[in-house]
Design a protein with these regions (language model features):
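Flexible, low-complexity inter-domain linkers and amphipathic docking helices that mediate domain-domain
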Residues: 1-90
């Protein structure tokens, strides 16, 4: 697991772009079709994929996240905000 996230992922904008691409891969969608304000469940992210997204976040950013992240923060914007705050506390 990485101890320091890539510098490019430290801004909220870059986190949002990275998350959008990551989630688009899981739901088999074009990243431009995902609305960052729309609940991820509506975009097709199920519980199995949500846990996989959490594992990818942990591996890439080097911070632990709860497997309920996508339900506690149900949009790309909300997750990016949460992660940005968590990274700032490191």
């Amino acid at each position: 697991m990485a101890t320091t996230p890539p510098a490019a992922l430290r801004s909220k904008t870059e986190l949002k772009l990275w998350l959008t691409a990551l989630i688009a891969d899981y739901v088999d969608a074009d990243p431009t079709s995902l609305d960052p304000h729309r609940p991820l469940a509506e975009a097709g992210l199920d519980s199995v994929y949500a846990v996989s997204v959490c594992a990818d976040i942990e591996e890439t950013l080097g911070i632990p996240v709860e497997p309920t992240l996508a339900w506690d923060h149900p949009t790309i914007d909300a997750i990016a905000e949460y992660l940005h705050h968590a990274l700032a506390l490191r």
